[in-house]
Amino acid sequence: MRPPARMPKLTRRSRVLIGVALAAVVLLLIGPRFIDTYVNWLWFGELGYRSVFTTVLFTRVVVFLVVSLLIGAIVFAGLALAYRTRPVFVPTAGPNDPIARYRTTVMARLRLFGFGVPAFIGILSGIVAQSYWVRIQLYLHGGEFGVTDPQFGLDLGFYAFDLPFYRLVLSYLFVATFLAFIANLLGHYLFGGIRLTGRNGALTRSARIQLVTLVGILILLKAFAYWLDRYELLSHTRGGKPFTGAGYTDINAVLPAKLILLAIAVICAVAVFSAIVLRDLRIPAIGVVLLLLSSLVVGAGWPLVVEQFSVKPNAAQKESEYISRSIAATRQAYGLTDEVVTYRDYPGNAPATAQQVAADRSTTSNIRVLDPNIVSPAFTQFQQGKNFYFFPEQLAMDRYRDADGNLRDYVVAARELNPDRLIDNQRDWINRHTVYTHGNGFIASPANTVRGIANDPNQNGGYPEFLASVVGANGNVVSPGPAPLDQPRIYFGPVIANTASDYAIVGENGTPREYDYENNVETRNYTYTGSGGVPIGNWLTRSLFAAKFAERNFLFSNVIGENSKILFNRDPADRVEAVAPWLTTDTTVYPAIVNKKIVWIVDGYTTLDNYPYSELTSLSSATADSNEVAVNRLALNKQVSYIRNSVKATVDAYDGTVTLYAQDETDPVLQAWMKVFPDTIKPKSEISPELQQHLRYPEDLFKVQRALLAKYHVDDPVTFFSTSDFWDVPLDPNPTASSFQPPYYIVAKDLAENNNSAAFQLTSAMNRFRRDFLAAYMSASSDPETYGKITVLTIPGQVNGPKLAFNAISTDTAVSQDLGVIGRDNQNRIRWGNLLTLPVGPGGLLYVAPVYASPGTSDAASTYPRLIRVAMFYNDQVGYGPTVRDALTDLFGAGADATATGPAPANLPDGQPAAQPPNGQQPAAQTPGNQAGRASTPPPAAIPSGPSGPQQLSEAKAAALQEVQEAMSGLQDAQRSGNFAEYGEALQRLDDAMNRYSEAR
């Protein structure tokens, strides 16, 4: 045997260069991670959730180290054993033996290969394993559900917390043993323990013992896997079955097969281990082949035979017991038990008189005519103020009580800063990050009314009534409603965070720098005084953030002083997910005024994907509807079989404070996480009454539940199997929609209490299976007293569903003719608002669809829509008019509108002349309807030119009055021109002038 050839040595310079290159690579890989880690440490500390950061980091590091050392040690043992038991003399196959060359290379770098390969595999395994920290923490802190599964009688906590951990450990042990087997096999082959030369080759005793032992361990691990497979059958779905969980075939064929395979695996393992003593590899080979054949015949073939010849011919009867299990488990897992859901029979098409409709005051006085998915451009046009302020494309719904204590729903929005709308010099780094730092204002519009009647698209009216709580021109907070507000400045929100670098640098450093508001004289600035923000007054933190954001101005700009702070991670949902990484958040957040502050309310869910017998649901599929598709805002593509709205979170819009409240304190998953992160979640009892008044039943949860109720309202397993009594979520009938109809937040009569009091609720119609007729009406209460109660009105017969109702409305002769005139020659774009379904009268359903018009055919934000008509449908009859009151009267007759809200009806009493339009304009065209004799609708009264009577005005007041008069003149010119866009701009100028007049002193 020739001595091994020496490897060429590197020069000192080469070694230095290689070392520098490796150090640079390591720095590039680790440096950003270190910076992010330290920045996150600062950020979590500023929020008061540093314990969350340290707990997660500690768990990840420990898991990484344990798995890396374990996997690396097992692989190292496989290599070390092969090396230490190598033959003393290894014959070669000649001078060109490739194995000899590889052997020489390895021997020359023995430490590199002996330690480097196991270390690399161990580190790689540790990196992957640390991502499973959630599963490990749930195993360590999970408790019991207090409910047992129907097959094995085990508490569901075993399936939720223990079984996933056991499967994780088994997977890593299997991978580690397999890698050790491969390493040992290659080691023996390389060092001569296995030789393939000659007729039969050669295998040393050490190689045989080691390889056989590893194969035996693998088979024993497979036996343990068969044992765990038994439990996982309960969350398994067999193809072609309408339910989830173990069915007849699984219980009577697959389950026994798993036990048989387990026994065979143990026998095969014994046979494999016997080769250690018997020195005959044929026995373990036969055992391995037997295990493979058994898995095919017993594990796959036998269940297939049972399924085809026993179950399928009698499926409804055979699967009946297991369908009942699935129905009960799914209802429990998704919060649809009888304690939560109340079913009531409801005619759906009962006749109603005008008096009966008017008696439903809680519903008729709150009929919603503002569609939050349409009116955002109107908010932008009338309430934007500056180019850099912005409203989201889809606004939110919430409720407040008016001065009389009546519950009313509002379209609400925060006037946020949108960095993407900054222009020219506003985009300069200093301006973007130190001047334009925050939004200003909470805007609310009553959802059941508009500011005037829009009898013609070129007349005034039809726009929302705005209640703007903002910093006024004198620096004081103007808060006309719907609730008192002390701090309208908004530093945190989804719009302001919708850019790559959403940070703002704030704090006292000389004169105020942040743009705040303007008056007639000057621009006034502001200095942030909130508790939120990471201090960046020292050079270390400035350097870190300069590296994080790749921005040198952190180092050289003098706008950063010793009291400066940086606000970043400003999206409310992202902040909640960061401090509660175990939560899945709702796709929508909404602003509310709580205790005189603006807060963002975020719904958080705890989920599982292995609840026994519960149906597995895709969140992205179940929550998709026409609203989500329109803005490409879909939930995570996450599979769940258990969900609870366990946490309500608030994010202060001014200082970013995140507060977590336990909403469902009985949730075992939440209880486990409260043990992992103690003192991070406040008990439900600490939710203030003011906040409780603004908690909504979460939309994503409701959509998941309605999708499941479409199937799991059925009690009888045979009927369930036939699918004959299933329901469907209706498609959105709006011509521009392309997905399911979204649920709608409304204020209407309380279905949970079954009385005529007003309640804020989330509602949805449900169709019959593959039909357009109604099957049910579903309502979830958001009122504190009945929060979470779901009422389902089951509707017999053939009552028109949303699509049929919309078709009847849109094809009605009077409706189509009127809208055809308004939209002629593409002068105006007609848009249908949300089609609401409202239970009214003694047992009927009223469909309400607002109609909007905007100039031209564009979807641009500048073409702001306004309400021009309201259409209704009840028992195959259509009502139509400029207002809710007109439509109710048209549909039910005189008196039906007695309790409705909104502008006075256009129908005037007999003998009363209609008011004439100002400035000599011609009256608008008469509105067609189902009843003749409708008079033209007068436009809103003109704004008075000024105070009446003798009055001595100050200089500022007189100047403001002159602006009002000029704005009124411009408004009249725009009215005569017939240009809708010019008219809107003129109206905005008049509004601004009136505001300045009222604030002038």
Curated annotation (Swiss-Prot):
Keyword line: Cell membrane, Membrane, Transmembrane, Transmembrane helix
Membrane topology value: Multi-pass membrane protein
Subcellular location: Cell membrane
Regions crossing the membrane: 16-36, 61-81, 112-132, 174-194, 209-229, 258-278, 286-306
Source superkingdom: Bacteria
Region (Disordered): 900-977
Compositionally biased spans, kind Low complexity: 900-929
Broad class of the protein's primary localization: membrane
GO terms for cellular component: extracellular region; plasma membrane
Family: Belongs to the UPF0182 family.
Protein name: UPF0182 protein Mjls_1469
Phylogenetic placement of the source organism: Bacteria, Bacillati, Actinomycetota, Actinomycetes, Mycobacteriales
